[in-house]
Amino acid sequence: MAMDGYLWMVILGFIIAFILAFSVGANDVANSFGTAVGSGVVTLRQACILASIFETTGSVLLGAKVGETIRKGIIDVNLYNETVETLMAGEVSAMVGSAVWQLIASFLRLPISGTHCIVGSTIGFSLVAIGPKGVQWMELVKIVASWFISPLLSGFMSGVLFILIRMFILTKEDPVPNGLQALPLFYAATIAINVFSIMYTGAPVLGLSLPIWAIALISFGVALLFAFFVWLFVCPWMKRKIAGRLEKESALSRASDESLRKVQEAESPGFKELPGAKPSDDSAVPLTSLAGEAVGASEGTSAGNHPRASYGRALSMTHGSAKSPISNGTFGFEGHMRNDGHVYHTVHKDSGLYKDLLHKIHVDRGSEEKPTQENNYRLLRRNNSYTCYTAAICGMPVHTTFRASDTSSAPEDSEKLVGDSVSYSKKRLRYDSYSSYCNAVAEAEIEAEEGGVEMRLASELADPDRPHEDPTEEEKEEKDSAEVHLLFHFLQVLTACFGSFAHGGNDVSNAIGPLVALWLIYQQGGVTQEAATPVWLLFYGGVGICTGLWVWGRRVIQTMGKDLTPITPSSGFTIELASAFTVVIASNIGLPVSTTHCKVGSVVAVGWIRSRKAVDWRLFRNIFVAWFVTVPVAGLFSAAIMALLMYICGLFSSSR
């Protein structure tokens, strides 16, 4: 059959297929490296480089198997023997419908399944072309079942693996010995699965024809060799690296404590007073410790029964003009000791501190229902108010702690400063001099917005004896120690590469499956499609996926790596390994499972095991709803394009 008249459709199909691959890369590749970026083991740029390599390799070696299911397993192509041009138009429609919906979802940062898109689009054009008889409904039922099986299976495998790791490694007082013993096993399992997948699916591409037992034997042998290499070289190197890191952190901690102790001894007798400060000025604002006045504090604490007073501050601000100390130099404070053992400082109302703290410290007014104290943090142990003020102006984060029990003023939220989330550049600043304070004020004035807010600020900085509520069992969240982070750092990178490889093999079919069908129909002049999937078409799809990742991938990486649940290297390793294992198995048996479903199932399962409240269930609900919405929406887009193309092809045929 002469197909030259439909060359325009093939050209259009290639263009749309690249756009579809672009959308797959922008949306689905986040499943592979999202957790690695979220746990901090790789940067976004490093993730893009690694994903580009492994996505392309996986698409070439594994993509042919699933591509056959996409292009021949969902619809009965034999019904189009007499109307080949209709099937070609349908393949173009399927790509358009899938690409449009995935681009919209990527723009909205909504992670959806590329498999859902292409399946729904294929069904949509078939219903328009020849009605419901063109759809192989039993195949569709199997695919729909896999949408539920894949997250459950992946989540179950991830959960079991994480429980074992937590039991034998994470909960140990010294996790290093058990972790080092398990490293060869972890690496061997990852390599074995990967090698088996390549040889089983990619053997025709490599020119090999081996029985399955031979492939399994080779995979097992390669895994043993790799495990021996890890045990012989990687484990001793990792042990030295962990010991060096711990020794360095211990030395830094000792030096920091010694430095703070010396400064505290030198500055504790009193506070400096700046020129222009008038303690008797009625415009001054008291700055005081509320450690003994907070709700829940004992009477003994208020009476000063502790051997040393806890230094904190409470800043009560009222509406009024504020001027920078750079312009008028009217910043001052003076310490006053009351008989309750607390130190009271006075801050001039017209000083720059008023304005700067007003704009730099944000009060969470939505926490009135929970006045109890959060975890204790110590910002600094020093009595130097310059240090506190400069740190606050530079943007120390604030967490709500308790409400002041001051009956003379309206109840307002109180907060404490937390110093564990400040950028490295901010930590390097000096906070203990007047010049550093003035520099911070000058920078803050440039960034500050005009306006005023009434607030009361309190921060507890130094009292380790203050009672605090332990988090409930549901609120507890396990965090990796420094040595555990190092143990699983490289493992998560390896499993992320493995997941990217599996993703390339599974999801390249979503973009290239219809294009392969379109190309084979045009080349052979029929719908039989007996030829194997061309490798260069798989490579073409891999390039499109990588392009989408570099341009738009970071939008969904944020959702998968950070928003759904916090990720650590240990939990990220289990998520990556179990979900990738599920995807590779599905790819090898030709079942187009969704990598999104596998990864979401693993993330939710491990996050729920780590902490009952660590999972963003609202986001999970939205993703779950999107799984159902994608198929009909993509089908509607495809059906509309199919109707348009059939109209155009009808005009074209009549004109000939």
Swiss-Prot record:
InterPro entries: Phos_transporter. The modification Phosphoserine is found at S253, S256, S259, S268, S316, S385. Residues 1-5, 68-86, 131-142, 212-213, 505-531, 588-594, 644-655 are extracellular. Residues 257-283, 459-478 are annotated as: Disordered. Residues 27-46, 108-109, 164-190, 235-483, 553-572, 611-622 are cytoplasmic. One of its GO terms (molecular function) is sodium:phosphate symporter activity. Glycans are attached at N81. The chain crosses the membrane at residues 6-26, 47-67, 110-130, 143-163, 191-211, 214-234, 484-504, 532-552, 573-587, 595-610, 623-643. It is found in: Cell membrane; Apical cell membrane. Signal peptide: none annotated. One of its GO terms (cellular component) is brush border membrane. Disruption phenotype: Mice develop basal ganglia calcification and display significantly elevated phosphate in cerebral spinal fluid, calcified optic nerve tissue, moderate to severe hydrocephalus, poor skeletal development, low body weight and significantly decreased postweaning survival rates. Juvenile mice exhibit abnormal endochondral and intramembranous ossification, decreased mineral accrual, and short stature. Adults exhibit only small reductions in bone mass and mineralization but a profound impairment of bone strength. Belongs to the inorganic phosphate transporter (PiT) (TC 2.A.20) family. Homodimer. Sodium-phosphate symporter which preferentially transports the monovalent form of phosphate with a stoichiometry of two sodium ions per phosphate ion. Plays a critical role in the determination of bone quality and strength by providing phosphate for bone mineralization. Required to maintain normal cerebrospinal fluid phosphate levels. Mediates phosphate-induced calcification of vascular smooth muscle cells (VCMCs) and can functionally compensate for loss of SLC20A1 in VCMCs. This is Sodium-dependent phosphate transporter 2. It comes from Mus musculus. The gene is Slc20a2.
